[in-house]
Amino acid sequence: MKSDNVRIGLERAPHRSLFKAMGYTDEELNRPLIGVANPMNAVIPGHVHLNNIAEAVQKGIYLAGGTPAIFGGIGVCDGIAMNHAGMKYSLASREIIADSVEIMATAHAFDGLVLICNCDKIVPGMLMAAARIDIPTVIISGGPMLAGSHPNVKNGEKIDLITVFEGVGAVKSGKMTEEELSLMEDEACPTCGSCAGMFTANSMNCLTEVIGMGLPGNGTIPAVMASRIRLAKQAGMAVMDMVEKNITPSQIMTPEAFANALAVDMALGCSTNTALHLPAIAHEAGVEFNLKQINEISARIPHLCQLSPGGYHRIEDLNRAGGIQAVLSELIKHNLINTDCITVTGKSVGENASKARILDPEVIRSVETPYHKEGGLAVLFGNVAPEGCVVKQSAVVDKMLVHEGPARVFDSEDEASKAIMDGLIKKGDVVVVRYEGPKGGPGMREMLTPTSVIAGMGLDADVALITDGRFSGGTRGAAIGHVSPEAMSGGPIAAVREGDIIKINIPEKTIALDVPEEEIKARMAGWTPPEPKITKGYMARYARNVESASKGAVVL
């Protein structure tokens, strides 16, 4: 076993002495050593309770005959980091998380890992680490937050964090008072857990379950339910079974598993950020991933779940309706899933889902009666985005699926947000936000503030926004991100000028700057990149080494 390097033999007496300094007994040191990553902190609602999950995981490892060794990890709350310099660091933290888990697992010769995570960049960071290290590993999430209840509406319809973001726009446009918004902010996030809709964190937790790196229930069991604690114990027991059978991530994270993940991604209407994270995870797993796969799979996988921000239902409803296993079961009935893929249970995807069924056909619709005939995401190509750009088509109102309008050009999110809040954006406009890509931002900030204000002002049915930055999983409307190549790398989005007509056709998967190619080339011939916004520290190094969003924004 790997841990023999720190436990067994005469030469390892100093190593054992150090373990004994922490209270480990000889009996514990004669068992497999399992690393437990616990990124608990008191800054993220989705991570504030992870000590409870970690305690349960450790109990599960002990129950199955292993010895847990817990270590910490960082985590950024995207909501708190939103709309200021902190958001530059969110995506970049994904690589730090992956690197730090690799360091801890390798330095201490763990035989297996249980990686606890829950929020936006922590989940993909942990998955990237699992693929890279390739020792028996189980991912266990902390679970979703429950939805809040609207304090300003009779019978209290469900609300979540995005309701509050959109409330800012409603106040700006006079549709809501500040007092009403204050009441809403008190009620929108009533428990710990990852934010309640199908935003990035829950998207990735659900896809972790589909890929096979998380146990059934991982994606949807709410944070505050006792069954989440039981699942954490089972995760600890499962990793011991994997160690015994030598089941590793490379056996689980196969091309077929990623195809399954994309299929369920389309059925659920997941965050556009999955189009960043799945390629990055696949890169670590040595699996080829092309953005065109999204359109190919979306064309044959219908959209079955209308979850917030694209609909009324929340993750707690999806859990009640049968969860991810019920979605898989429905897709399996129509031969849309590879059922042979192995999972952390030691069983196949098909075996895990064999007893699942849809318990609420309005939350999880059948393939015959979907919300939309195509899946949740689409990748658009054209002269403004030769390498592609991404939109959550399931959250776009029908009239905006095909749109053309004048470009309103901004070289930062801050400029765009101010213009929107000042009422300078009109119906029909196409807001262009550039120099916010992985290199240009740097860090590819989420544009939740401008898109939420647009929605809160009631303009989401009339205004589009395109950017080389990205969007929160909570974004809705004609919000088109990940434009590649980005402006900082000389992508043609840098050539767009105020008033240029931009044509968007989501059904046809096209986006075009209505300017002759000769003119675009002439504009770019006179273009020079702006000075870097950050010249020292981690983000300066990140900007120099990060790849295009079309490649998952991985750091080489």
UniProtKB/Swiss-Prot annotation:
Cellular component, GO annotation: cytosol
Record text on cofactor binding: Binds 1 [2Fe-2S] cluster per subunit. This cluster acts as a Lewis acid cofactor.
Residues annotated as catalytic: 472
Signal peptide (UniProt feature, chain positions): none
Gene3D superfamilies recorded: IlvD/EDD C-terminal domain-like (3.50.30.80)
Reactions mediated catalytically: (2R)-2,3-dihydroxy-3-methylbutanoate = 3-methyl-2-oxobutanoate + H2O; (2R,3R)-2,3-dihydroxy-3-methylpentanoate = (S)-3-methyl-2-oxopentanoate + H2O
Superkingdom: Bacteria
The entry's keywords: 2Fe-2S, Amino-acid biosynthesis, Branched-chain amino acid biosynthesis, Iron, Iron-sulfur, Lyase, Magnesium, Metal-binding
Residue intervals passing through the bilayer: none
Annotated Pfam families: ILV_EDD_C, ILVD_EDD_N
EC number(s) per entry: 4.2.1.9
Record-listed [2Fe-2S] cluster binding positions: 119, 195
Keyword field contains Iron: yes
GO terms (BP aspect): isoleucine biosynthetic process; L-valine biosynthetic process
Subunit structure, interactors included: Homodimer.
HAMAP family membership: IlvD
Family: Belongs to the IlvD/Edd family.
Protein name, entry field: Dihydroxy-acid dehydratase
Gene coding for it: ilvD
